[in-house]
Amino acid sequence: MDRIALMDAPDTDWSAWPAPAKLNLFLQITGRRADGYHLLQTVFRLLDWGDTVHLRVRSGGQIRRVGESLPGVAEDDDLVIRAARLLQSATGAQAGAEIRVDKRIPAGGGFGGGSSDAATVLVALNALWGLGLAADALAELGLQLGADVPVFVRGHNAWAEGVGEQLTPISLPEAAYLLVDPGVHVPTPALFRSQELTRDAAPAKIADFASGSLLDNAFEPVLRRREPAVEAVFQALSRVGTPRLTGSGSGCFVEFATRAAAEQALAQLPGGLRAWVAEGASHSPLLDARDARQV
């Protein structure tokens, strides 16, 4: 362990770090491992919109949350606190941190908010504490927090396999997205237990996605049957494009070639929906924030 990782760090002012949302442009389940985890294939698309994680380094080693970005979630259960403590434990870092999150990404919507926040803490504190861990090491730590964390650590759009941790960077065309949060949350484990879920899809290749033949999400038919609010959103979005589900839901989206087209579609939606527009990113703004501190 590099000695700098074992030293305390001086107190700093607050710094702001982006935690972008993501979309799953398709998602299929191809099998199940011996330990019960499902094997999947998906494409992660990073967005130019998301949460902001504020960090302040504190000497003495204490890690604490400031504010309550997730009402009802105990501090010890908060992914950002768990991420900071995991990094501290893994490296022997003696510095601490205060963490505050400006939440914009809906919790439990499949947009990756919790995972992205955790990844941002890992990447940012690695820089602020002067630890010097490589992306591979940070991604390995992130996997202990959740299968989606590594893609946010690496910061690139990716084809994903395994439980979502086997990542192959891919280039995606520019696009804008109309996003809708139906406002319902179904725990992912309950969806994986559903008898309606297709678990034996034929493994696909990146070329299949590139050809446009992969658009479906295995959780979509399950959620649309179970949740009237999700079905209502799909019906509303079908009037302006082809709606899709992200993650295990319940967030929905429609892809457009330009932001102007997405905003025009947004204006056509009925009132009462929580809807907004975001653009796809070629890479995570978190990487830009990290690199700016290294200059």
UniProtKB/Swiss-Prot annotation:
InterPro entries associated with the record: GHMP_kinase_C_dom, GHMP_kinase_C_sf, GHMP_kinase_N_dom, IspE, Ribosomal_Su5_D2-typ_SF, Ribsml_uS5_D2-typ_fold_subgr
Sites where the protein binds ATP: P106, A107, G108, G109, G110, F111, G112, G113, G114, S115, S116
EC supergroup of this enzyme: transferase
Pathway: Isoprenoid biosynthesis; isopentenyl diphosphate biosynthesis via DXP pathway; isopentenyl diphosphate from 1-deoxy-D-xylulose 5-phosphate: step 3/6
GO biological process entries: isopentenyl diphosphate biosynthetic process, methylerythritol 4-phosphate pathway; terpenoid biosynthetic process
The organism's place on the tree of life at top rank: Bacteria
Pfam families: GHMP_kinases_C, GHMP_kinases_N
Catalytic activity line of the entry: 4-CDP-2-C-methyl-D-erythritol + ATP = 4-CDP-2-C-methyl-D-erythritol 2-phosphate + ADP + H(+)
Matching Gene3D superfamilies: 3.30.230.10, GHMP kinase, C-terminal domain
Keyword vocabulary terms for this entry: ATP-binding, Isoprene biosynthesis, Kinase, Nucleotide-binding, Transferase
Residues at the catalytic site: K22, D148
Signal peptide range: none
EC number: 2.7.1.148
MF annotations from Gene Ontology: 4-(cytidine 5'-diphospho)-2-C-methyl-D-erythritol kinase activity; ATP binding
Its job: Catalyzes the phosphorylation of the position 2 hydroxy group of 4-diphosphocytidyl-2C-methyl-D-erythritol.
Family membership: Belongs to the GHMP kinase family. IspE subfamily.
Name the UniProt record assigns to this protein: 4-diphosphocytidyl-2-C-methyl-D-erythritol kinase
Taxonomic source organism: Xanthomonas axonopodis pv. citri (strain 306)
Organism lineage: Bacteria, Pseudomonadati, Pseudomonadota, Gammaproteobacteria, Lysobacterales
